Amino acid sequence: MRIFFASSDGIALEVLKKISDQYDVVGVLTAPDKPSGRGLSLKVNDIKREALSRKITVLQPVVLDADVINLVKSLEPELMLVFSYGKIFKQEFLDIFPVGCINIHPSLLPKYRGPSPIQTVILNGDSVSGITVQKMTLEMDSGNILAQSQFEIKSFNTSVDIFEYVSLNSFDLVIEALNKLLKGDIGIVQDKNNATYCSFLGKEHRTIDFKLSAFDIKNKINAYNPWPLARARLDNNEIIFYRADFISTNDYDDQVIGKIIAFDPSKGLLVKTGDGILVVLELQRIGKKVLDCVSFYHGNRDLIGKVFS
């Protein structure tokens, strides 16, 4: 089968490698190169780099216009596989592919349709999530489900952890979905009454409010890693938080909210919140290295009693 692959995110790299090993990938659609670093030199993303290493045609249009459509048609693809491309496809584009178009979405659809399912499932404190391969339609993430699996989310898992899991565990579902398509299986219609949605996460929400519960704060910290990274201030320095857990307890109720009350080598850096204790596991002073809580504490032994703001 001649497959056209669309992605702009490293989460899809393993799928691109495996699908290219087993099928004829005739083209890759990805985002334009972006300026990066102090010199603002153009940076090639992982998807483009892998495609070029395999001598696969790479398209990086700003707009999916008529010229792009004609170029894709000239590649004579049969199916399009999409995994975190970042743009909406019009029907004219979807109609190029006679076998159809399928999309990998990292949630248990119809739950968490939209651009940030991995972060949102952590923000909401869910204990399970999943991977869905669906047929593509004009309505976002609403196509028939061809394959789906679920996995457990641990309390201290970050978005980085889930991205890695999804990256390594999506390919088998793609094969299951392809086999169903070729057999004429239309999949399972999503129940729109159970659909929920997620939106883009921005920098404006990354500041930690320690008046919230420890559970909600640790969810925010873990969800916002690797971006936009939750943060607070300590001694007029910005501190970035990368990983956390929590303890549900009424102890320390007499302590000031945001106060670093203790360091426990077996748990982490303990911070008083509006409800419970935040256990900080990884953090960073701006401009310094990311450290585990033990290393951070040993380099800042005067932490106990200080207050985050």
Curated annotation (Swiss-Prot):
(6S)-5,6,7,8-tetrahydrofolate binds at S107, L108, L109, P110. The keyword Disulfide bond does not apply. Its EC number is 2.1.2.9. One of its GO terms (cellular component) is cytosol. InterPro entries: Fmt (IPR005794), Formyl_trans_C (IPR005793), Formyl_trans_C_sf (IPR037022), Formyl_transf_N (IPR002376), Formyl_transf_N_sf (IPR036477), Formyl_transferase-like_C_sf (IPR011034), Met-tRNA-FMT_C (IPR044135), Met-tRNA-FMT_N (IPR041711). Belongs to the Fmt family. Attaches a formyl group to the free amino group of methionyl-tRNA(fMet). The formyl group appears to play a dual role in the initiator identity of N-formylmethionyl-tRNA by promoting its recognition by IF2 and preventing the misappropriation of this tRNA by the elongation apparatus. This is Methionyl-tRNA formyltransferase. It comes from Borrelia recurrentis (strain A1). The gene is fmt.
